[in-house]
A protein has these predicted regions:
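Active-site PLP-lysine loop of aminotransferase-like
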Residues: 1-11, 96
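Conserved PLP-dependent catalytic core of the aminotransferase class-I/II
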Residues: 28-83
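Predominant activation on well-ordered alpha-helical scaffold segments within soluble catalytic domains
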Residues: 14-25, 46, 50, 83, ...
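Localized chelating/binding microdomains
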Residues: 7, 26, 30, 64, ...
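Amphipathic alpha-helix from the class-I
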Residues: 11-33, 50-56, 128
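PLP-dependent enzyme catalytic core of the Aspartate aminotransferase-like
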Residues: 105-149
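Conserved C-terminal alpha-helix-loop-beta "cap" of PLP-dependent enzymes
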Residues: 70-121
Length: 149
């Protein structure tokens, strides 16, 4: 048939549609609790990093952001070495999920220098993240920062 103006012909698989609807229902029911959990762990990560390290700048608003991410600039270190050392120890990124390895144009637009943008890191918290993960991340990041300064 020519359903969907010829874009998606064929009958929709009803079991998949029902399953998708149930998944959405569960996600919506858990959305508030999940956001609170992510925010709790993100704030613990930030507090631990700020407590143990000087020269950290928060990129973007800490209030107006999704609860699962944190983007920081680490001053006074070589960004390339920083990322290389972290690569084997912690899952993190130097930019957005769609970046091409270049310094973030968003960080540059926020007023970060090229050097600051190159020594920035994006950390994400997942639903499976726990307190042990946060403590380990703080430990790894702190030791890596101290080794490069």
């Amino acid at each position: 048939g020519g359903q969907e103006y010829g874009l998606r012909s064929g009958t929709l698989p009803l079991p998949l549609v029902v399953g998708f609807a149930k998944a959405i229902e569960i996600a919506v029911l858990n959305q508030k609790n999940n956001a609170e959990k992510l925010l709790f762990y993100r704030n613990n990560l930030l507090e631990g990093l700020l407590k143990n390290n000087s020269g950290l700048l928060i990129n973007g608003s800490i209030e107006k952001r999704l609860p699962h991410n944190l983007n920081l600039t680490v001053l006074d270190l070589n960004g390339a070495k920083f990322h290389k050392l972290l690569k084997s120890k912690i899952i993190c990124s130097t930019g957005s999920a769609c970046s091409n390895g270049e310094p973030s144009h968003v960080l540059l637009a926020l007023g970060r220098s090229l050097k600051e943008a190159e020594s920035s890191i994006r950390l994400s918290i997942g639903l499976s993240t726990n307190s042990k993960d946060i403590k380990q991340a703080i430990h790894i990041l702190t030791n890596t920062i101290k080794s490069l300064r």
